[in-house]
Amino acid sequence: MTTNTQTVDTSELAKFEAMAAEWWDPMGKFRPLHLMNPVRLDYITRQIAAEYGRDLKSPNPFKGLRILDIGCGGGLLAEPMARLGATVVGADAAEGNLPVARLHAEKSGLEIDYRHTTAEALVAAGEQFDSVLNMEVVEHVADPLAYLTACKDLLKPGGIMLCSTLNRNPKSFAMAIVGAEYVLKWLPKGTHDWRKFLTPDELTKLLEQAGLEPVDKKGMVFNPLSQQWSLSDRDLSVNYVTASIRPA
């Protein structure tokens, strides 16, 4: 598939290509995402359910919704969305991630449309979705505004985008770079570039410039004793997640 690479940072892609086989190893190089996934999913599902008036306790609550997981990796978010009944497209510019994602979905009995493509290429193809999951991606792209604008164009009017990233401050440098990559060695050194992190105010401004309406944001806070993540209304100092609507 031809991919428009306007916002793709090839050096960032190479990092994740090298780790592709480990996506579904909860003790491997993607352990931080496995630990974070429950709180990410809680936020995502509640926001989508609220936007579309869905009851999460009902069978297949997202049936009839078309959801894009951009930068899908091995499918850690795409698979739960499919289990909730959504029609899911998983897109990744790192082609090496996709065989892992496809194989795991097949073994799990899930139908997910995984594609080696980019946000810009999907826009050019005229694709649109009820929701776009844009989780831990924006800090890896070459042009955040162009990328977020493409993501906005992929939303149907009234659609919702969930976007998570890392704040840029001394605490995030200490925890996400020094702690995670050098001390705890949860991630390979160089996985993140602290200079590409975005403060909540910076991300809000970019979302607005892209034509989106930010409606919610929460911090995601890690407790090293319990090894669990939780949502916070106040602490957005390291990881945080936002919800934005494309105006109808």
Swiss-Prot record:
Pathway in which the depicted protein is active: Cofactor biosynthesis; ubiquinone biosynthesis
Pfam families: Methyltransf_23
GO-annotated molecular function: 2-polyprenyl-6-hydroxyphenol methylase activity; 3-demethylubiquinol 3-O-methyltransferase activity; polyprenyldihydroxybenzoate methyltransferase activity
Enzyme Commission no: 2.1.1.222, 2.1.1.64
Membrane is among the record's keywords: no
Keyword Magnesium: no
Catalytic reactions on record: a 3-demethylubiquinol + S-adenosyl-L-methionine = a ubiquinol + S-adenosyl-L-homocysteine + H(+); a 3-(all-trans-polyprenyl)benzene-1,2-diol + S-adenosyl-L-methionine = a 2-methoxy-6-(all-trans-polyprenyl)phenol + S-adenosyl-L-homocysteine + H(+)
One BP term from GO: methylation
Key words, A-Z: Methyltransferase, S-adenosyl-L-methionine, Transferase, Ubiquinone biosynthesis
Binding site for S-adenosyl-L-methionine: 40, 71, 92, 135
HAMAP family xrefs: UbiG
Family assignment from sequence similarity: Belongs to the methyltransferase superfamily. UbiG/COQ3 family.
Protein name per the record: Ubiquinone biosynthesis O-methyltransferase
Originating organism: Dinoroseobacter shibae (strain DSM 16493 / NCIMB 14021 / DFL 12)
GN (gene name): ubiG
